């Protein structure tokens, strides 16, 4: 089954499917660990297996025709190409928050945000991957790495960007116990955003898709979903957002408008369900300390104080620039008081005809910036030094933002710059995308 034109898909999996629980993880009452015959785990997460190859790219059969047994089986087919076996493992460690209560009685859940590099984009923008061996760009190879990584992580919620083979992913994730929802970009684009959630942990109360083309903001899309924690005595709900912001650094007005619109719509939906806490995931295509990042963190921005081409900070993150200035580069933007903003650009950016101020109603914090990390992996504001690496970019553009009502209990630390540089560019033999997966475990704030 293939996507044709625009696609909005929502799937659920039969109740017989089991969760896959890694050793050392937090187990919720009522869940049982299943045998993991062909998968191995460490106390610190290993994001890549010791061997891999690409599964078939054939279309999965209709989910309605599948049968499921109670005995868990690895949803990934056997590897068949020993010449594609990774020679090493890249380890990432969990970092616990030193400020969040650690009581196991607190209800918790784990969220992943992952730009998986669309198959079409990896082919169309081949110049970005000039240092990557062709076999490691093949979707079959990368799909296996990505799915194995996610199965090892065993998150409760997954938000993906650049998804253009949704049904390939869904067939595997469904067998691992996930339900899913997909929103394709508008226009002629073939990729979009996807959400997956553990169907035995969360139920979906409401979903909303955002097409930014309806507001004159290009063909990007975003997703919102109200999820309710099952088997909770307190009717816990969260609002999950997922976005892939426009890449083009020159169109800061559109990038700002997309983020502003997502925050506004998330606020309305959260209010509708009783001011429920919010988690916003995605590739925001903006770097730490950039005006766009500061807009998310501070809730407002005077656009006339900035050049719209510098709102995202991306132009300062070419690999040669980052490596020349060192891993502690400040990504400082040279602000200019610009008269180059047109009335239409101001309207798109701020949502108003006669105001230079863009604002959003949320109080957001970044989960990674909230959990103290290592100088080898974090910048001066606490964000990862790099979440994405290809021949023209080395830096951070991916984030997990959260609102009041939630606290980050721990995050999966990213990789040091020197480790990333040894790959000469992502994806590589061990990593299936040009982005790293961001992972945060959240707890609900204790009541009163």
Swiss-Prot record:
Region (Disordered): 50-92
Keywords for this protein: Cytoplasm, Exonuclease, Hydrolase, Magnesium, Metal-binding, Nuclease, Nucleus, Repeat, RNA-binding, Transcription, Transcription regulation
Record text on subunit structure and interactions: Component of the CCR4-NOT complex, at least composed of CRR4 and CAF1 proteins.
Catalyzed reactions per annotation: Exonucleolytic cleavage of poly(A) to 5'-AMP
Top-level taxonomic group: Eukaryota
Documented EC number(s): 3.1.13.4
Pfam family of the protein (one): Exo_endo_phos
Gene3D superfamilies recorded: Endonuclease/exonuclease/phosphatase (3.60.10.10)
Official protein name in the record: Carbon catabolite repressor protein 4 homolog 3
One GO MF term: poly(A)-specific ribonuclease activity
Protein location: Nucleus; Cytoplasm
Entry keyword annotation includes Lipid metabolism: no
Binding site for Mg(2+): 162
The protein's required cofactors: Mg(2+)
Keyword Metal-binding: yes
Comp. bias (Low complexity): 50-67
Organism: Arabidopsis thaliana
